[in-house]
Amino acid sequence: LRLRREMMVLADTVRETVSRLNPLAKKRGQQIVVKIQDECEMFADSGKLAQVCYNIIENAIKYTPDGGTITVSLAKVGRDAVLDISDTGVGIPAEDLPHVFDRFYRVDKARSRETGGTGLGLSIVKQIVRLHAGTVTVASEFGKGTTFTVQLPVK
């Protein structure tokens, strides 16, 4: 995996990704709320960071019941851009949390068959974020929802 770094604005990438996924969310009666506090200009691979946003938001749409809400927030905290993607979905059981970024790991095999996917999306997210010298973490309460936090250095 190689990066093509250039000066970019992370907020633009977030907005574009949300507009690409909005039709999918609307089909399920879901709302994607975008809260951008800072534009977050950075030297990074915009295509790869779009893939990070897409993979996490698409998962949120898949695992959030019809009528649910996905919130995408971006702010600059210190020297980092902090992107939070939260949903009101089914959540992830505590015992599965340490494994969500593992290749081919699926939290719920039965649910996976109906939602599709390969189990690679979040491992790709972690790989891309690490190549940008950032971190990605997950917090979840089973039955209440999940929040993924991506932290990336801003120049």
PLM feature spans:
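Short helix N-cap motif at coil->helix boundaries in the Bergerat
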Residues: L10, G91-D102
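Short beta-strand/loop element within the Bergerat-fold HATPase_c
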Residues: G67-R79
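Acidic ATP/Mg2+-coordinating residue in the GHKL
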Residues: D87
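Short helix-loop "hinge" at the ATP-lid/N-box region of the Bergerat-fold HATPase_c
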Residues: A60-I61
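Conserved catalytic submotifs in the C-terminal HATPase_c
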Residues: R4-M8, K26, Q31-C40
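Short alpha-helical segment within the cytosolic histidine kinase core of two-component systems
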Residues: R15-K27
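Conserved glycine-rich
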Residues: A133-G134
